[in-house]
Curated annotation (Swiss-Prot):
It comes from the Bacteria. Belongs to the ATPase delta chain family. GO terms for cellular component: plasma membrane; proton-transporting ATP synthase complex. F-type ATPases have 2 components, F(1) - the catalytic core - and F(0) - the membrane proton channel. F(1) has five subunits: alpha(3), beta(3), gamma(1), delta(1), epsilon(1). F(0) has three main subunits: a(1), b(2) and c(10-14). The alpha and beta chains form an alternating ring which encloses part of the gamma chain. F(1) is attached to F(0) by a central stalk formed by the gamma and epsilon chains, while a peripheral stalk is formed by the delta and b chains. F(1)F(0) ATP synthase produces ATP from ADP in the presence of a proton or sodium gradient. F-type ATPases consist of two structural domains, F(1) containing the extramembraneous catalytic core and F(0) containing the membrane proton channel, linked together by a central stalk and a peripheral stalk. During catalysis, ATP synthesis in the catalytic domain of F(1) is coupled via a rotary mechanism of the central stalk subunits to proton translocation. Disulfide bonds: none annotated. One of its GO terms (molecular function) is proton-transporting ATP synthase activity, rotational mechanism. This is ATP synthase subunit delta. It is found in: Cell inner membrane. It is a peripheral membrane protein.
Length: 177
């Protein structure tokens, strides 16, 4: 997967720089998100790994995307198809989002809990993470019953596991060693 990230980075950077220059970050993120979903589609994945000519592949991909891509987005698709890189579109989107977050000095934080958290709890988590990361945070909340109780907080390569499940797993590791 790190190979795809390396391959995706220059495309994401080019799209990001273009979007910043033309003040169209939202539009580009939407286009990349749509194109990434198309690339993830099972039938499209088969086409991407097939032996279609790059021009045919690009035009098919653009036709499927329809009016979701403007002329510049279509050009990106053509260049990526020419280089056989359409399958890395989800990674391009991920890199684009990271570049945008760095520009806006925000970081996405994933909060996983066993049940929905109150606004007060979310505010406390947000404040604590902003202090710890020295950046504004955007919380993405998920519910996972297997957490049992507590929360798991992920931001980049930082993981704070305050869940009962995590504590039980650590206890089991200690008891088995």
């Amino acid at each position: 997967m790190s190979e795809f990230v390396t391959v995706a980075r220059p495309y994401a950077k080019a799209a990001f720089d273009f979007a910043v220059e033309h003040q169209s970050l939202d539009r580009w993120q939407d286009m990349l998100a749509f194109a990434a979903e198309v690339a993830k589609n099972e039938q499209m994945a088969e086409l991407l790994s097939g032996a279609l000519a790059p021009e045919t592949l690009a035009e098919s991909f653009i036709a499927i995307c329809g009016d979701q891509l403007d002329a510049n987005g279509q050009n990106l698709i053509r260049v990526m198809a020419e280089n056989g890189r359409l399958k890395v579109l989800p990674d391009v989107l991920e890199q684009f989002i990271q570049l945008r977050a760095a520009l806006e000095a925000t970081v996405e934080v994933e909060v996983t809990s066993a049940s929905a958290l109150s606004d007060e709890q979310l505010a406390k988590i947000s404040a604590a993470m902003e202090k710890r990361l020295s950046r504004k945070v955007k919380l993405n909340c998920k519910i996972d019953k297997s957490v049992m109780a507590g929360v798991i907080i992920r931001s980049g390569d930082t993981v704070i596991d305050g869940s009962v499940r995590g504590r039980l797993e650590r206890l089991a590791d200690v008891l088995q060693s």
